[in-house]
A protein has these predicted regions:
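Subtilisin-like serine protease catalytic core
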Residues: 10, 16, 79-114, 118-169, ...
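N-terminal domain-start motif of subtilase-like serine proteases
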Residues: 1, 37-43, 61-94, 117-128, ...
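Active-site glycine-centered loops adjacent to acidic/histidine catalytic or metal-binding residues
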Residues: 96, 210, 234, 320
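Active-site neighborhood of phospho(di)ester-bond hydrolases with catalytic His/Asp-centered motifs
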Residues: 189-191, 229-234
Length: 368
C-alpha cells in the first residue's frame, strides 16, 4: 500500500504483511482493515509501522405480532388497496443470532440461511433472539396466530452468534450487506449494535461502512435497486446521546421502541429505549415502533429464555428495540411492495422507502 504524506512522498509497505506478522488469528475484514490479536507489549511496534493508520479495540456487539400490527395500522394498510400488501415478492435479510428454520411459521420461505462467523452452525441455541426477530418480520402465525408484519415475504438469514460461547460476533459489514444484497434482499434488518458507552452517539467506522453500502446501492448511475437498512437504537435510555453504533449511521433507519401490550401508550417511548441526538447533532432514532412485550416465534432449541415475560410452546414474549426494529422492517417491506406493485416503481431506492416510512409515521410531539 502506497501512503502519501503532505509533500506527496510515499512509503511502500504492504499492510497485509504487517497484519500477518503482528496479529494472531488474523482476519481480513475489508480493504485496509484487519482484525486479530496481539500482545500489549507489541503495541508500539505495530503503531510505528508506516501503513498502520489507526488501531482500536474490537467493539462488543449485543442484541439490543398481533398488538404490534394494530398499533402500526398494518391490517388497514394491507387491505386498503385492490392488491393486498403482505410482503409477496420481497426478500428480507435478518442478521442475528441464529434461526430455528424448522419452526412452522416460516414454511418454505427461507431462501438462504448463511453462517457468518465460522462456527459451522446457524442454530439458535441460546435466547432464540434471531428466530423471534425474523418471525416478527415475516412469520405467518401458523403455529398459533402470532403472525408477523409481512407474512408472505421470503427470508435470507445471516447467523452471527457462536453456539459454543453465546457471544455475538459481527463480520465485515460490507460483506454482510453485500452478501444479502446479492441474494436478492432489499430490506436488511439488524437488532444489534455496540454496547460500548464510550462510542455512544459517535459516527464510527462501522456507521461509515453501512452508509457506504447504502449510498452505493442507491446510486441511480449504478443501475441497481436500493437497499433499505434498519438498526435498533439500543436499550440504554432514558438519557440523551445513548444511541450506539452502527445505529448512528446517516442512511439507516434507526428504530426506538414503544409499548406494544399491557399498559403504556403507543406514543410514548419506553424508558429503556436509547435516545439521540448523535454527537454531530442529528436526530436519532428516526422512528419508534412496537417493542414492548412483543410475542413472536420461540426457537425450539433455545436453552436460555428466562428473560422472556411470557411463553408458550411455539411463542414467547420479549421487550426492547430489538423487537421494535423487525416491526419497522416489516412495514418497510410492505412499503417497498406498494411502490413496486401499486405505484409501478420497479426499483425503489432505499432512501425513498426510508422517507415514506418516516413521513408516514405519527409525530409524538416529543423527543423524550
Amino acid at each position: 500500500t502506497a501512503i502519501a504524506d503532505a509533500d506527496g512522498n510515499t512509503i511502500q509497505q504492504d499492510l497485509s504483511q504487517v497484519a500477518g506478522l503482528a496479529l494472531d488469528d488474523v482476519e481480513h475484514l475489508d480493504q485496509g482493515q484487519y482484525r486479530g490479536l496481539f500482545s500489549s507489549d507489541s503495541l508500539l511496534d505495530v503503531v510505528r509501522q508506516p501503513s498502520v493508520m489507526w488501531l482500536r479495540f474490537e467493539p462488543q456487539m449485543d442484541f439490543d405480532n398481533d398488538q404490534s400490527k394494530n398499533h402500526m395500522k398494518i391490517n388497514t394498510m394491507r387491505s386498503y388497496f385492490t392488491t393486498d400488501l403482505d410482503g409477496s415478492g420481497q426478500i428480507v435479510a435478518v442478521a442475528d443470532s441464529g434461526l430455528d428454520e424448522d419452526h412452522g411459521d416460516f414454511g418454505t420461505r427461507v431462501v438462504g440461511n448463511y453462517e457468518g462467523i465460522g462456527d459451522g452452525s446457524t442454530a439458535d441455541k441460546h435466547s432464540g433472539h434471531g428466530t423471534h426477530v425474523a418471525c416478527t418480520v415475516l412469520g405467518d402465525g401458523s403455529k398459533g396466530g402470532y403472525a408477523g408484519v409481512a407474512p408472505d415475504a421470503e427470508l435470507y438469514f445471516q447467523a452471527m452468534e457462536n453456539d459454543n460461547t453465546g457471544n455475538f460476533v459481527s463480520p465485515s459489514l460490507n460483506y454482510l450487506l453485500n452478501t444479502a444484497y446479492n441474494a436478492g434482499a432489499r430490506i436488511h434488518t439488524n437488532s444489534w449494535g455496540s454496547s460500548a458507552t464510550s462510542t455512544q452517539g459517535e459516527y464510527t467506522s462501522e456507521a461509515e461502512a453501512v452508509d457506504d453500502r447504502s449510498f452505493n446501492y442507491d446510486k441511480v448511475s449504478n443501475g441497481q435497486e436500493g437497499l433499505t437498512i434498519l438498526f435498533a437504537a439500543g436499550n440504554d435510555g432514558p438519557n440523551p446521546g445513548t444511541v450506539g453504533s452502527p445505529s448512528t449511521a446517516k442512511n439507516v433507519v434507526t428504530v426506538g421502541n414503544h409499548q406494544a401490550r399491557y399498559s403504556g401508550a403507543p406514543d410514548n417511548l419506553m424508558s429503556g429505549s436509547s435516545r439521540g441526538p448523535t454527537d454531530d447533532g442529528r436526530i436519532k432514532p428516526d422512528i419508534i415502533a412496537p417493542g414492548g412485550y412483543v410475542r413472536s416465534c420461540r426457537a425450539q432449541e433455545a436453552q436460555d429464555i428466562g428473560s422472556s415475560s411470557w411463553q408458550s410452546t411455539w411463542y414467547l414474549e420479549y421487550t426492547g428495540t430489538s423487537m421494535a426494529t423487525p416491526n419497522a422492517a416489516g412495514a418497510a417491506t410492505l412499503i417497498r411492495e406498494y411502490l413496486i406493485e401499486i405505484a409501478q416503481r420497479p426499483s425503489p431506492q432505499g432512501a425513498l422507502v426510508k422517507a415514506l416510512l418516516v413521513l408516514g409515521a405519527q409525530d409524538i410531539n416529543s423527543r423524550d
